[in-house]
Amino acid sequence: MDDNSANALRLTYHFAGPPDLVWAIWTRPDLIRSWFGSSHGFRAHDIAVDLRPGGTWSLRNVNGDVTEHVSGTYHEVEAPHRLVYSYHFEGTDFFSIISADLVPEGDGTRLHFLQTGFPDAQARVEHAQGWPHALRVMGDALLAMHGVGMLWPALPEKTHLDGVARDLEAARERLAREAAQ
């Protein structure tokens, strides 16, 4: 994996929930739909996930009349701590590798994100703008899983609510402010 700074996007993000719930948002088709493509107004459809080394994933990303087909192969699957997979926009020369490391941190999870293999500087810039938005949407989806905002069907057990109460209150306030705008 070529992770030199000119060809790599590195991000860290704190989620208000344990690694197993962050893992679920990242890997379950019913939850991927909540965040994937959101930074550019897209909505994910036809999500397929074969979550094992050598398994594949794919989806159709739609924004009005624009459709993108995105797919890849899982290289490392160490639930709920490490996920490495390829990321390809069909019909383009865009092939990259993403690694997501989920580390327990206090009552939450610290994500260490690395994406490499950008075909040009512009692609890296676009992803550097898009991923932070997607991670915020993922964080909001995680809070919704805890009962803030809309509820998801077939959720993991809510055994991890202890310790996130202060984060939930902050999220409630933020969601109320955003709804008022």
Model segments located where?
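Hydrophobic ligand-binding cavity/cleft-lining segments
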Residues: M1-G41, L168, R172-Q181
